[in-house]
Amino acid sequence: MNIKGKALLAGCIALAFSNMALAEDIKVAVVGAMSGPVAQYGDQEFTGAEQAVADINAKGGIKGNKLQIVKYDDACDPKQAVAVANKVVNDGIKYVIGHLCSSSTQPASDIYEDEGILMITPAATAPELTARGYQLILRTTGLDSDQGPTAAKYILEKVKPQRIAIVHDKQQYGEGLARAVQDGLKKGNANVVFFDGITAGEKDFSTLVARLKKENIDFVYYGGYHPEMGQILRQARAAGLKTQFMGPEGVANVSLSNIAGESAEGLLVTKPKNYDQVPANKPIVDAIKAKKQDPSGAFVWTTYAALQSLQAGLNQSDDPAEIAKYLKANSVDTVMGPLTWDEKGDLKGFEFGVFDWHANGTATDAK
């Protein structure tokens, strides 16, 4: 082969490798609970992420490059979350959708911020997460400081109980919400008889039930997740208590109904709106159902919106810092509607709703 032919061949090879590089997948870490007591919320997250990525890639991906999900399990455990965050760093991934629980998201976010990795959490609601001046942390859900007052307002204006107990699981998410509700109720001069914590993972709540009965409690707000809430409901009803219960989106899971059975009927919950009921989202709902998955979970939609937000940013830059700046300065159309963020990375104008939970695992607007 002559020199000219060799040069032409080399050029073709270089072009081929260049095109291969352009077609490389963009890896996105999706981190949540795949194991442990709240793995059902991880199921919601991964359902939303997988559908979002499938839809984004079907429409051309990011400038011709496809998104690729890399799943990580932190079990909503802070120590595991740190290990996962370090694994994400070692794997060279620059974008994270997750984590879910506030207690695991916060320590992981320290690592991501230090390493220049963008994190968009679809579920962590603790205000402390974005109150530390970090630049690379955003969320597609609201805050405890939004959800707590929503619950308190409904309790004061609609339920009007006489004797209230506030119970929490002593974790960042649950206790934070419980305190936010307590603050709102105190402002309304409600009679909060006691504020106390239980141990996450506990299954025998006979002592708590006896206390509710002794104190003539007619309303209980619980800050925490569905495994304990389900047991408390079941045991309270078995003891003959007619007490009204309320909890956050952390209890709004079909597994709650599996635990509590008919005792779950009438539970009040605060959570994001039912995005699966939005007409424009029907094609996504149908696609998820076709895979025998459940589209009703709140985190399905906040995760889908997180991927849409990342997509919008990646269409501008592949630099995590530039993506964060873009999102904080622009509105993004998502399955949740248009999303805008403040300088801290919190959504502007996010609203929680109040719903009646039913024994069949569905939720309807509370009256």
UniProtKB/Swiss-Prot annotation:
The keyword Lyase does not apply. GO terms for cellular component: ATP-binding cassette (ABC) transporter complex, substrate-binding subunit-containing; membrane; outer membrane-bounded periplasmic space. Keywords: Amino-acid transport, Disulfide bond, Periplasm, Signal, Transport. GO terms for biological process: branched-chain amino acid transport; isoleucine transport; L-leucine transport; valine transport. InterPro entries: Leu-bd (IPR028081), Leu_Ile_Val-bd (IPR000709), Peripla_BP_I (IPR028082). PANTHER family: LEU/ILE/VAL-BINDING ABC TRANSPORTER SUBUNIT (PTHR47151), LEU_ILE_VAL-BINDING PROTEIN (PTHR47151:SF1). This is Leu/Ile/Val-binding protein. It comes from Escherichia coli (strain K12).
